[in-house]
Amino acid sequence: MPGHEELAVGAVASGGIPVLNRQEVRFVSDNQIEETTRRVRREVERQEVLYRKGRPARRLTGQSVILVDDGAATGATMRAAISAVRAQQPARLVVALPIAPPETCASLAKSVDELICLIVPKVFFSVGQWYDDFSPCTDDEVCELLDGLENPVEVGT
């Protein structure tokens, strides 16, 4: 949401298909949505190139997949990730979140095989309110973590 960047009214994951929260985007102009979608697609593509470092995308078909995020307010970013993963036909899809409001948990649970959410507060303002430091990860931090997974252990489905 312009001016409230932590509140996701939509998201774009790998593959570029936008997922919009229709209830929230009614306050955003079509031009803003189109421009933001183009900008976010470019950023997702940039991150994929940087983070993969020439490695192919991991095949998820027939695999068990666990999607993890630092929390979900509207669930838009997680819905985009779910959509991107579902397109690859995993055997099982689990979402794990430390914090999300009840309505978001209920909505996400309908889209996955299992939803794990540690804290589901009745009163919820933002994901960041539950963290002492809610700074975003830098590209360098992400690359360092991914580099440590050069030869990840494969676990059966």
Over which residues does each language-model region extend?
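PRPP-associated nucleotide enzymes
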Residues: M1-T157
